[in-house]
UniProtKB/Swiss-Prot annotation:
Phylogenetic lineage: Eukaryota, Metazoa, Chordata, Craniata, Vertebrata
Family: Belongs to the sodium:solute symporter (SSF) (TC 2.A.21) family.
Ranges annotated as spanning the membrane: 15-31, 57-80, 85-105, 131-157, 164-181, 190-208, 244-266, 279-301, 336-363, 387-408, 412-437, 442-465, 521-545
Annotated GO MF terms: iodide transmembrane transporter activity; monoatomic anion:sodium symporter activity; protein homodimerization activity; sodium:iodide symporter activity; symporter activity
Sequence ranges on the Cytoplasmic membrane side: 32-56, 106-130, 182-189, 267-278, 364-386, 438-441, 546-618
Name of the protein this chain belongs to: Sodium/iodide cotransporter
Length: 618
C-alpha cells in the first residue's frame, strides 16, 4: 500500500490527545492512591520494597514492564520489519534469563535480605567494589532512562508534530510525582496498568492491520515471499545483527545483566513475601515479556507487508526506521479518531514504567550504599523523607539527561541495549565471579571490572565511529517500486534497500581493519563481551595475587552453599523465636527488613544467622 503522499504530514487530533491524557491521569491516580493508602510509607523499607509484602502477579507484570519501554514499543517492530520474524528468538533468550535468575541469583539476594544488590559486593569483596558497582549502575541507569524518555518524544515529534517539550515534561513530571509520593507500591501497580495499555495498543494495531491486508494467511504469505519468516537463521557469524545465536548467547547475557543483578529488577522480586512467590513473579514476568515482544514483532511484520511496495524510508516520508510505527498508526487509523491516541498511550506507558522503576531504584541504591553507611543512626521517618527527596532529584536529573540526548544515533533499541550492555555486562561478570568462584578476591574483581568496561566500551565506540554496512548486518531488501511518482521524493537514486544512513563497508577507504571485524559484531554481544572479559581477567588476577580462602567467606555468599542451608536471614516478624524460624524453609521465610549494623557475613553465631546443613532441592 502506498499510504499518504510524502509531502503530507499526519498529526494527532483532539481525541488522540484526550486518550493520551486519560492514560496519564489514570497512572497518576493509581500511583497516588496506592502510595498514600494506609498512611503511606513509614520506613525506607516500605518506600523501596513495599514492606516486602507484595504479591507475585503484580510484581511479575512490573518486572515485564520495567524494561519494555517506549524504546521497545518503537524499536522492536522496526527491527522485525527490517530483519524478519527471527526477532522472536529474543523470547528464548528472555526465557533462559528468567531460569538463570531464578536458579542462580534470586536465592542469594532474597535470603540475604538485601535492599541494594551492591551490598552483596561489599559482603563478598570490599566497600571499594561496592562503590564501583553503585557508580556504574547510577551512570548506566541515568543514561538509559534519558534515552527512554527522550527518544520516543523526538520520534513522535518528527513524524506527527507532537510537541517534544510537552511530551517530555508531561511524562517526566507525572512519573516523578507518583514515584516520589508512592514509592515501590505505586511503581508496581502503575506498571500493571501500563502493561495492559501496551498490550491493548499492540493488539488493536495488529487486528486493524491484518484486516486491511486481507487476513492473517495473506500477511504470512506475503511476508514469507519477502524472506521475513526467517526463524531458521543459525548463522554463527557474530557480525550478523540478529540470528539464533545472537539472541541465545548475546541476548541472554544482556537480559541477565538486567534481571539477574540490576537493582531495578532485584528490588522487585525481593519485595515479594516469600522466595517461592519471588520465583513465581519471574514466571509471570516471562509470560508478560513473551506477549509484549511477540506482539511487537508481529506488528513489525504487518508493518512491512503494508509498506512492502512503497517503503516510507526510501521515499523520504520518514528519516529513520524507528519512525515506522507511529507512521503506520496514523496511516491505518486515519478514519478512526482517538485510536492513534491509544498507540501514543501505549508508547508512553512503556516510558512511564521504565522511568519510574529507574528513579525508585537509583534512590534505593543511593540510600543503602551511600547514605546509610555514613549515617547509620538516621530515624526511619528521616530516611523516608530523604528517599522521596532523592526520587525527586533523580527524576529531574533524568529529564535533564533526556534533554541532552539529541546526539543519540543508530536507533533507539540499539542505543538502549548498548548502554546497558557496556556498563551492566561487566557488573554481571563481577557478581557471577563472587557467587561461583570462591577464590576471587578484591584486586581480581576490580581489575576484571576495569577490563570488561574498557573492552565493551572500546567496541561500542568503534562501532559508532565506523558503523558496519547493512549487508554485513543482514538488513533485508525493501522496495519503492509501487509508489506513485510524486511520493518518491527523498529516496537515494537507484536505492533498493532501506537505509538509515549507515555506510557500506566499501565506501570509506580510511576505515581501520577492525571496522569490518571486531567493531562490526552485533550490539547484543557487547554485554557478553564485557561479562566474559570481567570473569576471565578477574579469575586470573585473583589467582596471581593470592586467591581468597573459601573458609574466610561468610554464609549465604556462594551459590554452591545454597543446598546446605534453608535461610541466612531471620523472618520478618520480630516476635518469631529462633526455634520457630529454624523449622521454616526458604519458601516460607520472608526477607528480613532489618539487620544489626554490626552483622558480618561470617558471624555464624549471630542470632540472625540461621544457616544449617539440610537436604533441599533448589
Amino acid at each position: 500500500m502506498e499510504g499518504a503522499e510524502a509531502g503530507a504530514r499526519a498529526t494527532f487530533g483532539a481525541w488522540d490527545y484526550g486518550v493520551f491524557a486519560t492514560m496519564l491521569l489514570v497512572s497518576t491516580g493509581i500511583g497516588l492512591w496506592v502510595g498514600l493508602a494506609r498512611g503511606g510509607q513509614r520506613s525506607a523499607d516500605d518506600f523501596f520494597t513495599g514492606g516486602r509484602q507484595l504479591a507475585a502477579v503484580p510484581v511479575g507484570l512490573s518486572l515485564a514492564a520495567s524494561f519494555m519501554s517506549a524504546v521497545q514499543v518503537l524499536g522492536v517492530p522496526a527491527e522485525a520489519a527490517r530483519y524478519g520474524l527471527k526477532f522472536l528468538w529474543m523470547c528464548a533468550g528472555q526465557l533462559l534469563n528468567s531460569l538463570l535468575t531464578a536458579f542462580l541469583f534470586l536465592p542469594i539476594f532474597y535470603r540475604l535480605g538485601l535492599t541494594s544488590t551492591y551490598q552483596y559486593l561489599e559482603l563478598r569483596f570490599s566497600r571499594a567494589v561496592r562503590l564501583c558497582g553503585t557508580l556504574q549502575y547510577l551512570v548506566a541507569t541515568m543514561l538509559y532512562t534519558g534515552i527512554v524518555i527522550y527518544a520516543p518524544a523526538l520520534i513522535l515529534n518528527q513524524v506527527t508534530g507532537l510537541d517534544i517539550w510537552a511530551s517530555l515534561l508531561s511524562t517526566g513530571i507525572i512519573c516523578t510525582l507518583y514515584t516520589t509520593v508512592g514509592g515501590m507500591k505505586a511503581v508496581v501497580w502503575t506498571d500493571v496498568f501500563q502493561v495492559v495499555v501496551m498490550l491493548v495498543g499492540f493488539w488493536v494495531i495488529l487486528a486493524r492491520g491484518v484486516i486491511l491486508l486481507g487476513g492473517p494467511r495473506n500477511v504470512l504469505s506475503l511476508a514469507q515471499n519477502h524472506s521475513r519468516i526467517n526463524l531458521m537463521d543459525f548463522d554463527p557469524d557474530p557480525r550478523s545483527r540478529y540470528t539464533f545465536w545472537t539472541f541465545i548467547v548475546g541476548g541472554t547475557l544482556v537480559w541477565l545483566s538486567m534481571y539477574g543483578v540490576n537493582q531495578a529488577q532485584v528490588q522487585r522480586y525481593v519485595a515479594c513475601h516469600t522466595e517461592g512467590k519471588a520465583k513465581l513473579a519471574l514466571l509471570v514476568n516471562q509470560l508478560g515479556l513473551f506477549l509484549i515482544v511477540a506482539s511487537a514483532a508481529c506488528c513489525g511484520i504487518v508493518m512491512f507487508v503494508y509498506y512492502k511496495d512503497c517503503d516510507p524510508l526510501l521515499t523520504g516520508r520518514i528519516s529513520a526506521p524507528d519512525q515506522y510505527m507511529p507512521l503506520l498508526v496514523l496511516d491505518i487509523f486515519e478514519d478512526l479518531p482517538g485510536v492513534p491516541g491509544l498507540f501514543l498511550a501505549c508508547a508512553y506507558s512503556g516510558t512511564l514504567s521504565t522511568a519510574s522503576t529507574s528513579i525508585n531504584a537509583m534512590a534505593a541504591v543511593t540510600v543503602e550504599d551511600l547514605i546509610k553507611p555514613r549515617m547509620p543512626g538516621l530515624a526511619p521517618r528521616k530516611l523516608v523523607f530523604i528517599s522521596k527527596g532523592l526520587s525527586f532529584i533523580y527524576g529531574s536529573a533524568c529529564l535533564t539527561v533526556a534533554a541532552l540526548s539529541s546526539l543519540l544515533g543508530g536507533g533507539v533499541l540499539q542505543g538502549s541495549f548498548t548502554v546497558m550492555g557496556v556498563i551492566s555486562g561487566p557488573l554481571l561478570g563481577a557478581f557471577t565471579l563472587g557467587m561461583l568462584l570462591p577464590a576471587c578476591n578484591t584486586p581480581g574483581v576490580l581489575s576484571g571490572l576495569a577490563a570488561g568496561l574498557a573492552v565493551s566500551l572500546w567496541v561500542a565506540v568503534g562501532a559508532t565511529l565506523y558503523p558496519p554496512g547493512e549487508q554485513t548486518m543482514g538488513v533485508l531488501p525493501t522496495s519503492a517500486a509501487g509508489c506513485t511518482n510524486d511520493s518518491v521524493l527523498l529516496g537515494p537514486p537507484g536505492a533498493t534497500n532501506a537505509s538509515n544512513g549507515i555506510p557500506s563497508s566499501g565506501m570509506d577507504t580510511g576505515r581501520p581493519a577492525l571496522a569490518d571485524t571486531f567493531y562490526a559484531i552485533s550490539y547484543l554481544y557487547y554485554g557478553a563481551l564485557g561479562t566474559l572479559t570481567t570473569m576471565l581477567c578477574g579469575a586470573l588476577i585473583s589467582y596471581l595475587t593470592g586467591p581468597t580462602k573459601r573458609s574466610s567467606l561468610g554464609p549465604g555468599l556462594l551459590w554452591w552453599d545454597l543446598a546446605r542451608q534453608t535461610a541466612s536471614v531471620a523472618p520478618k516478624e520480630d516476635t518469631a523465636t529462633l526455634e520457630e524460624s529454624l523449622v521454616k524453609g526458604p519458601e516460607d521465610i520472608p526477607a528480613v527488613t532489618k539487620k544489626p549494623p554490626g552483622l558480618k557475613p561470617g558471624a555464624e553465631t549471630h542470632p540472625l544467622y540461621l544457616g544449617h546443613d539440610v537436604e533441599t532441592n533448589l
